[in-house]
Amino acid sequence: MIRQWPSPAKLNLFLYITGQREDGYHLLQTLFQFLDYGDTLTIDVRQDDAIHLLTPVAGVPDEQNLIVRAARLLQQHCDRHGLNTAPRGAEISIEKRLPMGGGLGGGSSNAATVLVALNDLWRCGLSDEQLAELGLALGADVPVFVRGHAAFAEGIGERLQPANPQEKWYLVAHPGVSIPTPVIFGDADLKRDTPVRPLNVLLQATYANDCEPIARKRFREVEQLVSWLLEYAPSRLTGTGACVFAEFDTETAARQVLNQAPEWIRGFVARGVNVSPLHRIRSGQIEP
């Protein structure tokens, strides 16, 4: 039985804001790819219905933590629909590698890993599609992590189409600041009218992120980081930031640049993968 479950990072290889709904949600087109790097969750089934997070995050109550919320959401769904009467409790701990507020999808990935893992461990029998639909209540990015394949997303991020971008190597760097998503989406200067284009057109265009100009304007550290990385390779913001990634054809090239990074830059090198490590471990392609 698997105890340790990967919770991978994601990159937005491009991100375009195409409009805004009356309820305030932004419409977008984005290309998600996973990284072979992320957090690790250790999950053990309890013989009661208690959900215990053994590694709480300072300043974040359990009822707001996406790990706990995901476990309780699945628990309530299974109870409501009478799915398996086996004990459905869990003890969960996390080895955290991904920065908060970095644009790497850490919280959404954690929630998705909990849904996928506990669905297996509790023998709930839900399909990935059902789990993805359930996970949407936790965040717009959760479904792509649940489904586990690189994807082109539209709408508010919930309409997913499988995609297979090149699996390049990336230097992912954090400027030392966290950027709350509302800071970017609430900025009056954010471009919200990028034309909607079909995927085949977007894949042939130069990739960009409509959130990047706002992040660079409002956070001097992001501006400095992007400017430094652009000296070495094509680089851009992921999500709403604050992490920036530079793309390379080889791991060696990426590590050479990381080794030259100033002390204020914290980063790692990882490979882009189109099948999530979470799903590869479930299918036995990689060892737990």
Curated annotation (Swiss-Prot):
E.C. numbers: 2.7.1.148
NCBIfam families: ispE
Source organism: Serratia proteamaculans (strain 568)
Catalyzed reactions: 4-CDP-2-C-methyl-D-erythritol + ATP = 4-CDP-2-C-methyl-D-erythritol 2-phosphate + ADP + H(+)
Gene Ontology molecular function: 4-(cytidine 5'-diphospho)-2-C-methyl-D-erythritol kinase activity; ATP binding
Binding site for ATP: 99-109
Quaternary structure and interacting proteins, as annotated: Homodimer.
Active-site residues from the entry: 10, 141
Biological role stated in the UniProt entry: Catalyzes the phosphorylation of the position 2 hydroxy group of 4-diphosphocytidyl-2C-methyl-D-erythritol.
Keywords associated with the record: ATP-binding, Isoprene biosynthesis, Kinase, Nucleotide-binding, Transferase
InterPro entries: GHMP_kinase_C_dom, GHMP_kinase_C_sf, GHMP_kinase_N_dom, IspE, Ribosomal_Su5_D2-typ_SF, Ribsml_uS5_D2-typ_fold_subgr
Biological processes per GO annotation: isopentenyl diphosphate biosynthetic process, methylerythritol 4-phosphate pathway; terpenoid biosynthetic process
Protein name per Swiss-Prot or TrEMBL: 4-diphosphocytidyl-2-C-methyl-D-erythritol kinase
Pathway in which this enzyme or protein is active: Isoprenoid biosynthesis; isopentenyl diphosphate biosynthesis via DXP pathway; isopentenyl diphosphate from 1-deoxy-D-xylulose 5-phosphate: step 3/6
Protein family (similarity comment): Belongs to the GHMP kinase family. IspE subfamily.
Matches recorded under Gene3D superfamilies: 3.30.230.10, GHMP kinase, C-terminal domain (3.30.70.890)
SUPFAM superfamilies reported for this sequence: GHMP Kinase, C-terminal domain, Ribosomal protein S5 domain 2-like
